[in-house]
Amino acid sequence: MLDGYVSFLLKIKKKWNCRKVIHIGDVVDWSILSYHEKNPSMPSAGDEYQKALKQVQQLYRAFPRTTVMTGNHDDLPARQARSSGIPAELLRSNSKIWETPNWDWRPRYASYVYEGVTYVHGDRGKGGLQAALKNAKENFTSWVQGHLHTQGGCSYFANQDSVVFGLSTGCGINYEAASMDYGKRFSAKPVMGCGVVLGGHQAFFEPMPI
């Protein structure tokens, strides 16, 4: 997580007087558990966990009541367990792993509807440019998603009966970390920020100054 990101989120919460907080996922990276090629200079799984736990606790202290859309990286321990034939009954929940008893962790691929707006992590449905708007059109409901680090912004679509929006929330990753080495070859870089939804009818992307 980028230094200063939690402080930025708190400022946005105060600015808009937000009553509800939804973490769109991923909460953590779990680079060491990734199925992709790994950087040999990366810390061990135990070291990565301890470092990530400190960051998660920063978020938890700032936002003690949060709905969390479990992302593909959040789910890596369970995915690795399945690959190894370990049943889900033997695993700890994300709530226990990250010591967040008051967070409402939703299952991977789940959707969460609040004030008529659908929230998902973003690793299902349509992708590509303006993925959030594509999914809003596909489901004809206002749609908020993350997952795609290089997308942040809101677009609207209307037919003769109603208007929907697609909001991409951006992210708060530390793109200079060793775990993000894979992104160095791409021109597009992560868009830092967060999303704000007002009354289920208006949405804004708030970019983080960097």
Question: Can you annotate each of these PLM segments?
Answer:
Residues L2-T100:
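Core catalytic region of metal-dependent phosphoesterases/phosphodiesterases
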Residues S7-L10, K54-V56, W105-S111, G128-L133:
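A generic local structural motif
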Residues K11-V21, V27-H36, Q57-R61, Y112, ...:
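Feature recognizes metal-dependent phosphohydrolase scaffolds
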Residues P40-S41, V113-Y119:
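Short, basic, glycine/proline-bearing loop/turn elements
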Residues R65-T67, N102-D104, T118, F165:
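Conserved beta-strand segments of alpha/beta enzyme cores
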Residues V68-H73, P107-R108, E206-P209:
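Acidic carboxylate-rich catalytic motifs and surrounding loops in phosphoryl-/glycosyl-chemistry enzymes
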Residues K96-Y114:
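Short acidic low-complexity segments
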Residues V117-M208:
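Conserved beta-sheet core of the metallophosphoesterase superfamily
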